[in-house]
Amino acid sequence: NLYQFGNMIQCANHGRRPTRHYMDYGCYCGKGGSGTPVDELDRCCQTHDDCYGEAEKLPACNYMMSGPYYNTYSYECNEGELTCKDNNDECKAFICNCDRTAAICFARAPYNDANWNIDTKTRCQ
């Protein structure tokens, strides 16, 4: 779920950047997404959005409150290393891996302050 995703981001980047800095970045980090990603970090968000889209198509994720935004999965954070636990069902495992992959991607990608809170109407066509 989104709360766990935020915690994964903090784990992967060792708390160096607040999660809220990723909520309104580029064309894809935050609610919605369109156009061409502005940089590597924005591509991480586009990939994460696409992964959630795939999760929503899974039969195992096709029931009320089972989607990627609400479903609670089991994972572990150990000194920046993220592990999705084996006790997750198919849907939870898929969502956990979407979030894990994105959190690692965020931690590796450079953050450009100029791409925070951009005018998406003009920059994300």
UniProtKB/Swiss-Prot annotation:
What tissues is it present in?
Expressed by the venom gland.
State the protein's purpose.
Snake venom phospholipase A2 (PLA2) that blocks neuromuscular transmission, but that does not produce blockade by virtue of a selective action on nerve endings. Instead, the toxin acts both on nerve and on muscle. PLA2 catalyzes the calcium-dependent hydrolysis of the 2-acyl groups in 3-sn-phosphoglycerides.
Query: What family is reported?
Result: Belongs to the phospholipase A2 family. Group I subfamily. D49 sub-subfamily.
Q: Which domain of life is it from?
A: Eukaryota
Q: What is its EC number?
A: 3.1.1.4
Which organism is the protein's source?
A: Notechis scutatus scutatus
Required co-factor? Ca(2+)
Q: Locate the residues binding Ca(2+).
A: 28, 30, 32, 49
PTM entry text? No glycosylation was detected on this protein.
Q: How is the cofactor bound?
A: Binds 1 Ca(2+) ion.
One GO biological-process annotation of the entry reads: arachidonate secretion
Location in or out of the cell: Secreted
Q: Which residues are named in the active-site annotation?
A: 48, 99
Q: What is this protein called?
A: Acidic phospholipase A2 HTe
Q: Name one GO cellular component term.
A: extracellular region
Disulphide bonds annotated for this chain are 11-77, 27-124, 29-45, 44-105, 51-98, 61-91, 84-96
Q: CDD domains of this UniProt entry?
A: PLA2c
Q: Which molecular function terms from Gene Ontology are attached?
A: calcium ion binding; calcium-dependent phospholipase A2 activity; phospholipid binding; signaling receptor binding; toxin activity
Catalytic reaction(s) noted? a 1,2-diacyl-sn-glycero-3-phosphocholine + H2O = a 1-acyl-sn-glycero-3-phosphocholine + a fatty acid + H(+)
Q: Does the keyword Hydrolase apply?
A: yes
